[in-house]
């Protein structure tokens, strides 16, 4: 449901599904699914590892987007209700 809404939103903007925004959106959906799974299955260590890998990928994509286009980064963060990256 949510994914289809975002895909139609992206098609209106004429951006491909390989765009950074769509990748971050799909990683966020996977992260939310895995988080709810891990609340029930605390000792599922393979899922924990997968979650950490996806978090790292999303973090790298968000860092790239914040360097290249700060406005699109801010819009995406607000749309997905996720926190900003920590700067070193």
From Swiss-Prot:
Keywords: Chloroplast, Plastid, Ribonucleoprotein, Ribosomal protein. The keyword Transmembrane helix does not apply. SUPFAM superfamilies: S15/NS1 RNA-binding domain. GO terms for biological process: translation. The keyword Disulfide bond does not apply. One of its GO terms (cellular component) is chloroplast. GO terms for molecular function: structural constituent of ribosome. It is found in: Plastid, Chloroplast. Belongs to the universal ribosomal protein uS15 family. Part of the 30S ribosomal subunit. This is Small ribosomal subunit protein uS15c. It comes from Olimarabidopsis pumila (Dwarf rocket). The gene is rps15.
């Amino acid at each position: 449901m949510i994914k289809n809404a975002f895909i139609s939103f992206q098609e209106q903007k004429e951006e491909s599904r390989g765009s950074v925004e769509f990748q971050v959106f799909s990683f966020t959906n996977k992260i939310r699914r895995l988080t709810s799974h891990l609340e029930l299955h605390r000792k599922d260590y393979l899922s924990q590892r997968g979650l950490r890998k996806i978090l790292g990928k999303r973090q790298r994509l968000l860092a790239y987007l914040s360097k290249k286009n700060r406005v699109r980064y801010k819009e995406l963060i607000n749309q997905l209700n996720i926190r900003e990256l920590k700067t070193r």
